[in-house]
């Protein structure tokens, strides 16, 4: 009767470590050895003894019942049966007891020689090919050359069978009988045994020293990299010494996982469904047993070797079947799922079972609208509620003494007897439920509601909660979850109740904004109508106005005068006479008086502002009531107004025909120009598109005027549009204007869609012709296809964002940093995209901000910038404010509250423990789907805005030019003008009186300038204009043109137009890279003045030998044709930025300020040389196919692109530094979202970018433990440098016994040691100062950054699971469970919000008790003081 020990793992652990398992450990955790491949007896269905399901090893199949049936029942618990050897215990031990298989020969673990980087290969310095040939028994490897060393045979040499036998023949007789430890013995083996011996003999310290030396001193870069790679593996093993030994990468004992985790289920018909693992284990056991027998009967070496190879292969496929070239397949030709596969991917252990579990106490059903619900309520069907709250009802039934046992109570509930409804009402009070709608893209996808029981089978949802859930009632389903514990109920009520979540965490705007019918109703009753009944009446107060309306004396839209309560300048509520309408009075009955009197027409936009104001003035609770009032009023009025529309409400403007006619005439004109040869085909196309775009937008404007003046603007269609209830200008334009230009379907992989130049002239009311309809279908279908594809992308983006930022939590109040970001208005040319007010609101200022004119302190350093302060700053002349930002936060873990600023969901400073990283990821990911879903609304309509090709003065101002280079010309009208020939020219408009810069514009190269530097211009004056359709190259000198390298059909082709017979020279990319087309300008005498390169695709507009004047165009390069706007800008661009990828055609960027000289042409690249004033020279190669943006002698700044294309983030980081690249990424991503009209606060992007910039790469390791080129965390880097700061490195140990050369010691220890040596007159220790490491900041894409986090659990559950675990095991990594994912995987509370680790230690007690403890403490202290 032996007893087994219980080893339960505690669940309150705080760290998880991973490492290689030693054979001893596997044995210790095993409950017995599996000897037979049998699983269960097919007749009795009982497990076979010693087989894969053996009860003796893994435990009984039935609770408390042994195999032979001698012991049954719980009273024999813990007894081991003497007949069958099964311990009598619960059957659930079969989920946790492991077994093992003792292998006859060791095998190599496939993870460590098949996956890259090849660990065993790097340790031994063997290439993968050679390693394979050893492991799979093709070659012998020399482990110890012994006496054969003089014959030139060295360790690690590979021998074929013949060579090996030859050597054996030449060995001295007794050599093979020597001990293995004898250095003279010749040893060579094959297979994993050989590798085991080699690994066991490694001296890691010596190897590390040698590799470090090689990495530091080797001249060849390749060998250096090789050494560094090997060094990394060696260092991992040295760092995890004691936990990991290299030889443990060779498996001698295979663990067998518990049988319940690889079940065998009998199906009907005598067949079995089994886990693939059983097959894989079975093959291992069969081969292992066969090998045992072959060795016993002393089979020939060849047979044994084959069997050993097969054993190695079967263990390989058990561990990782997908790694192998020939995966083991089932009969159906499906590869078997191995142990690694069960961890990988969406269906793997991590993502399927640990991060997302199905839970009980849940239900789901279709949702319907519940307009009479309050903001915090939802309707739950009776039957669903009875099932969800079942245990609660049973408890109450027993408490009330209605039934005695649980079983009978269950029956009553199942029969749905009337008594339970009363109890259910009682139970549901104060017991909220959580509603969730998939996909849960942000935290508002799960909210808590107070349930109400309703008849029917559908869940009722409050209409205002729809926006947050992104729900509609066309058949959406939602899931209900029940929080059980008191803590959960409390959190649901306090934090998650729908009426508390009115603000959107992404941007702080209200998210519960009434939509559709509600908006329409409110808009309708707040609209004024001239000449309505009772116009001009005056009332003494709202009551009288309402009485008059109810009596039918005054119309709801009539403009009347009423004395109402409103706010004066100081914000006090006073009675004022206002011109208003009865409708507005009705609305203001609901609005809280603190907000004042709302005397405007209410649209969706203004409603959002009103709700914001109500929240600020009255708090969340009153806002929820206000929203309910607004909802009821809106529905009621939309119903009373009868706001439907008919065909007559869709008005087609009379002017349409004339406009279209004019369009046709203009197009004819363009075509005749083309036929006469004045313009190229490309220009013709661009101009035609332009004409129709103009016609369309003009028609739209006329249409809007027409429809808005119809019936005083009470046209139903117009009201729906204007109130923001439904529809857009685009849609109305297509209903009653014209559909306009359409995009052409493009071939797969071709560049963006061209636009069909014949527009659709009809609208939907007139109906489309067959051809028009056909053209339309393409857009509509493309829209649907895009949507389906892009939704998946958006989801994946969200997942990567969460993974990179889930461990960013507010961990402290103030990190004490002195750095910040400088914030200004964000401008694009002239228009302000984001005001300073928006950008600094709710942030913390770094310095005191003082009003420059009055000198008053607006905000102290370290204080939050509130609405009032931000407004004051915006109104003052202050241009920029330095604010705290997460990008500059210096917290060790997470970020601090001051650097984050305000929590947008509450409008207060963020609290400790807020999971800001996840919020940021959700805020960016959630609109991602909108980025995608916005395409097809345009129906593929090509919105190509007419090109803007001039600079016009917007105000009276003085002009200042920078970097301006021009040549004088006479333009086509005969006016004198200048042509700009510099690339960096800028013009500043300066206010004549104040000297403030009003705006700055780039003056493009090749534009015609009509003003002089310093000139004062009137408003509306044309400053400059340029050709919108072509980029040009202009001569700066007058002279004769001579072409070089311009050869027909080599570097140019001639396009002639059939219609016009006009011929054009177009430069093409030549196969012969030595021929470079260029144009020289010569003087009369034939001296060279200037040379211009002719770029590929340029149209040459002059002849060879022609005379040109300065300022004349020699080449036109047609700009890319107007492409149809599609999302592809959207999501892929965001991904590209967050992944820090280099754009497809990166620009070549100058790294220094300096002067440009053109070099020679090398291999199809033009060399550009930049020389700085200090004499530094940088050379760049630009492919000839690219247009070069600089000319000879131009002066460029660092960061100026030398060729066309986009600048890469890596270049920005290298040249302009981290701050510049951070701002660049944040602003670029913001641009994509802004374009879609999505508002997201900057701080969310900052958090993601902070996570992308966490790592540095080591340049010089100095005396630290880092390696060159190693990527480490900034924090780790700083800590390591701090650790060796001020310490000394021993150069010569002298006569010291304690210190060795190369050791790092503190100054104090050194002093003690040297004084001791001095006393004994011995040679002292010589030292030098320790050298710190140096590093370079790097930018990582979010995927890389997520895989590089300190937590291996988080990384493994993200992507590349096997690789991550593989690395982690070798490094012996320890996961401190600091992020969210790790804790969810372990089943712990997340370390954020109420689960913040500080709160664990808090003891909650009563105040009196606390006071009593304090009093006692005082007396104790006094007593001590007396002594």
UniProtKB/Swiss-Prot annotation:
Assembly and binders: The RNAP catalytic core consists of 2 alpha, 1 beta, 1 beta' and 1 omega subunit. When a sigma factor is associated with the core the holoenzyme is formed, which can initiate transcription.
Pfam family, one: RNA_pol_Rpb1_4
Annotated signal sequence range: none
Gene: rpoC
Cited function: DNA-dependent RNA polymerase catalyzes the transcription of DNA into RNA using the four ribonucleoside triphosphates as substrates.
Cofactor or coenzyme needed: Mg(2+); Zn(2+)
Residues involved in Mg(2+) binding: 472, 474, 476
Catalytic activity, as annotated: RNA(n) + a ribonucleoside 5'-triphosphate = RNA(n+1) + diphosphate
HAMAP family: RNApol_bact_RpoC
GO MF, one annotated term: zinc ion binding
Name of the protein in question: DNA-directed RNA polymerase subunit beta'
Biological processes annotated in GO: DNA-templated transcription
């Amino acid at each position: 009767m032996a007893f087994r020990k219980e080893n339960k793992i505690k669940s309150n652990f705080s760290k998880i470590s991973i490492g290689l398992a030693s054979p001893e450990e596997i044995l210790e955790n095993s409950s017995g050895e599996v000897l037979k491949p049998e699983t269960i007896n097919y007749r009795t269905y009982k497990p076979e003894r010693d087989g894969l399901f053996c009860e003796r090893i893994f435990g009984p199949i039935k609770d408390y019942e042994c195999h032979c049936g001698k012991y049954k029942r719980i009273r024999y618990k813990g007894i081991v049966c003497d007949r069958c050897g099964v311990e009598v215990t619960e059957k659930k031990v079969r989920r946790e007891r492991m077994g093992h298989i003792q292998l006859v020969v060791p095998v190599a673990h496939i993870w460590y020689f098949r996956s890259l980087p090849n660990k065993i290969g790097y340790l031994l310095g063997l290439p993968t090919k050679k390693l394979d040939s050893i492991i799979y028994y093709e070659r012998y490897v020399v482990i110890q050359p012994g006496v054969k060393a003089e014959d030139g045979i060295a360790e690690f040499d590979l021998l074929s069978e013949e060579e090996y036998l030859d050597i054996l023949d030449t060995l001295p007789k007794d050599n093979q009988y020597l001990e293995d430890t004898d250095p003279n013995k010749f040893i060579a083996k094959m297979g994993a045994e050989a590798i085991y011996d080699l690994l066991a003999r490694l001296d890691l310290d010596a190897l590390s020293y040698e590799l470090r030396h090689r990495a530091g001193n080797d001249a060849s870069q390749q060998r250096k990299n090789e050494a560094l790679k090997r060094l990394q593996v060696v260092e991992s093993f040295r760092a995890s010494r004691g936990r990991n030994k290299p030889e443990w990468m060779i498996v001698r004992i295979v663990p067998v996982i518990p049988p319940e985790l690889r079940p065998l289920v009998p199906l009907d018909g005598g067949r079995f469904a089994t886990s693939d693992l059983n097959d894989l284990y079975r093959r291992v056991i069969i081969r292992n047993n066969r090998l045992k027998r072959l060795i016993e009967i002393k089979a020939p070496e060849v047979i044994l070797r084959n069997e050993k190879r097969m054993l190695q292969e079967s263990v390989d496929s058990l561990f990782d079947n997908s790694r192998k070239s020939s995966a083991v397949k089932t009969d159906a030709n499906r590869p078997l799922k191995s142990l690694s596969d069960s961890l990988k991917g969406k269906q793997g252990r991590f993502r399927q079972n640990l991060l997302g579990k199905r839970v009980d106490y849940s239900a789901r059903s279709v949702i319907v609208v519940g307009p009479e619900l309050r903001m915090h309520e939802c309707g739950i069907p009776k039957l669903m509620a009875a099932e969800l709250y079942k245990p609660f009802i049973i408890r109450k039934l027993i408490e009330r003494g209605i039934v005695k046992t649980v079983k009978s109570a269950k029956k009553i509930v199942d029969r749905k007897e009337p008594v339970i409804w009363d109890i259910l009402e009682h139970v549901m009070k104060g017991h909220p439920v959580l509603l969730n709608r998939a996909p849960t893209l942000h935290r508002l996808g799960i909210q808590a509601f107070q349930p109400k029981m309703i008849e029917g089978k559908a869940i009722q949802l409050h209409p205002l909660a729809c926006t947050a859930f992104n729900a509609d009632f066309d058949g959406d389903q939602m899931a209900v979850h029940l929080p059980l514990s008191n803590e959960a109920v409390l959190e649901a009520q306090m934090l998650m109740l729908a009426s508390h979540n009115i603000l959107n965490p992404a941007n702080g705007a209200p998210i519960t904004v009434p939509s559709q019918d509600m908006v329409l109703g409110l808009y309708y009753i707040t609209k004024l109508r001239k000449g309505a009944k009772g116009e001009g009446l005056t009332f003494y107060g709202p009551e009288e106005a309402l009485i008059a309306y109810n009596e039918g004396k005054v119309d709801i839209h009539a403009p009347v005068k009423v004395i109402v309560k409103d706010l004066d300048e100081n914000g006090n509520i006073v009675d004022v006479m206002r011109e208003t309408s009865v409708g507005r009075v009705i609305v203001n009955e609901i609005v809280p008086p603190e907000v004042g009197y709302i005397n405007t027409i209410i649209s969706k936009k203004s409603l959002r502002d009103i709700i914001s104001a109500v929240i600020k003035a009255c708090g969340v609770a009153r806002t929820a009531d206000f929203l309910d009032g607004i909802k009821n009023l809106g529905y009621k009025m939309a119903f009373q107004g009868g706001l439907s529309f008919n065909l007559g409400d869709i008005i087609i403007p009379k002017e349409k025909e004339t406009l279209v006619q004019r369009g046709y005439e203009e197009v004819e004109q363009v075509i005749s120009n083309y036929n006469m040869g004045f313009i190229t085909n490309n220009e013709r196309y661009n101009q035609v598109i332009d004409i129709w775009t103009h016609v369309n937008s003009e028609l739209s404007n006329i249409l809007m005027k027409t429809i808005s003046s119809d019936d005083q603007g009470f046209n139903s269609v117009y009201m729906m549009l204007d109130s923001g209830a439904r529809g857009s200008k685009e849609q109305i334009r297509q209903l009653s204007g014209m559909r306009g230009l359409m995009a052409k379907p493009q071939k797969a992989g071709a560049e963006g869609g061209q636009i069909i130049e014949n527009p659709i002239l009809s609208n939907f009311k007139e109906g489309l012709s067959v051809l028009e309809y056909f053209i339309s279908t393409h857009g509509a279908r493309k829209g649907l296809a895009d949507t389906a594809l892009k939704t998946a992308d958006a989801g994946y983006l969200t997942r990567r964002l969460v993974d990179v930022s889930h461990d960013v939590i507010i961990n402290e109040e103030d990190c004490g940093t002195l750095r910040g970001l400088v914030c200004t208005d964000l401008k694009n040319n002239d228009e302000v995209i984001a005001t300073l007010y928006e950008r600094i609101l709710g942030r913390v200022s770094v310095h005191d901000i003082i009003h420059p004119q009055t000198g008053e302190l607006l905000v102290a350093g370290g204080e939050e910038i509130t609405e009032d302060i931000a407004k004051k700053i915006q109104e003052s002349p202050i241009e920029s404010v330095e604010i705290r930002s997460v990008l500059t936060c210096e917290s060790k873990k997470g970020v601090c509250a001051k650097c984050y600023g305000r929590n947008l969901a509450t409008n207060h400073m963020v609290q400790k423990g807020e999971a800001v990283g996840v919020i940021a990821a959700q805020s960016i990911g959630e609109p991602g789907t909108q980025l995608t879903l916005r395409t097809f609304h345009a129906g593929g309509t090509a919105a190509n805005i007419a090109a803007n090709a001039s600079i016009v003065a917007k105000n009276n101002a003085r002009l200042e030019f920078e970097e301006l280079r021009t040549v004088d010309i006479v333009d086509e009208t005969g006016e004198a003008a200048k042509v700009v020939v510099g690339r960096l020219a800028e013009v500043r408009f300066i206010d004549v009186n104040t000297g403030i810069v009003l705006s700055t514009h780039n003056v493009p190269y090749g534009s015609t300038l009509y003003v002089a530097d310093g000139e004062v211009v009137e408003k509306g004056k044309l400053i400059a204009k340029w050709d919108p359709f072509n980029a040009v190259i202009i001569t700066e000198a007058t002279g004769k043109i001579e072409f070089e390298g311009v050869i027909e059909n080599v570097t140019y082709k001639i396009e002639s137009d059939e219609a016009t017979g006009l011929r054009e020279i177009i430069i093409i990319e030549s196969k012969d890279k030595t021929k470079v087309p260029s144009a020289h300008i010569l003087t009369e005498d034939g001296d060279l003045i200037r040379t211009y390169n002719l770029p590929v695709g340029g149209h040459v507009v002059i002849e060879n030998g022609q005379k040109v004047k300065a300022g004349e165009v020699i080449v036109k390069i047609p700009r890319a044709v107007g492409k149809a706007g599609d999302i592809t800008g959207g999501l892929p661009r965001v991904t590209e930025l967050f992944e820090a990828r280099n754009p497809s055609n990166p620009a070549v960027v100058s790294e220094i300020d300096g002067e440009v000289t053109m070099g020679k042409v090398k291999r199809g690249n033009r060399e550009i040389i930049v020389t700085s004033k200090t004499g530094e020279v940088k050379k760049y190669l630009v492919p000839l196919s690219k247009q070069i943006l600089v000319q000879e002698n131009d002066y460029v700044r660092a960061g100026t692109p030398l060729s066309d294309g986009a600048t890469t983030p890596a270049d920005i980081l290298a040249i302009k530094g981290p701050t510049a690249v951070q701002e660049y990424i944040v602003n670029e991503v913001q641009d994509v979202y802004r374009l879609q009209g999505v508002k997201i606060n900057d701080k969310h992007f900052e958090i993601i970018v902070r996570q992308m910039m966490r790592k540095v790469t080591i340049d010089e390791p100095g005396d630290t433990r880092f390696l060159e080129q190693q990527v480490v965390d900034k924090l780790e880097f700083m800590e390591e440098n701090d650790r060796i700061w001020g310490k000394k490195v021993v150069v010569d140990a002298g006569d010291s016994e304690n210190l060795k050369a190369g050791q790092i010691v503190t100054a104090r220890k050194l002093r003690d040691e040297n004084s001791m040596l001095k006393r004994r007159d011995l040679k002292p220790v010589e030292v030098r100062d320790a050298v710190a490491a140096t590093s370079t900041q790097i930018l990582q894409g979010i995927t890389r950054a997520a895989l590089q986090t300190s937590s291996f659990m988080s990384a493994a559950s993200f992507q590349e699971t096997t690789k991550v675990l593989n690395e982690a095991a070798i490094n012996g990594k320890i996961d401190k469970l600091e992020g969210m994912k790790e804790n969810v995987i372990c089943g712990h509370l997340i370390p954020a919000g109420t689960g913040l680790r500080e709160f664990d230690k808090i003891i909650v007690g009563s105040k009196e008790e606390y006071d009593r403890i304090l009093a006692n403490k005082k007396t104790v202290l006094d007593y001590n003081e007396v002594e």
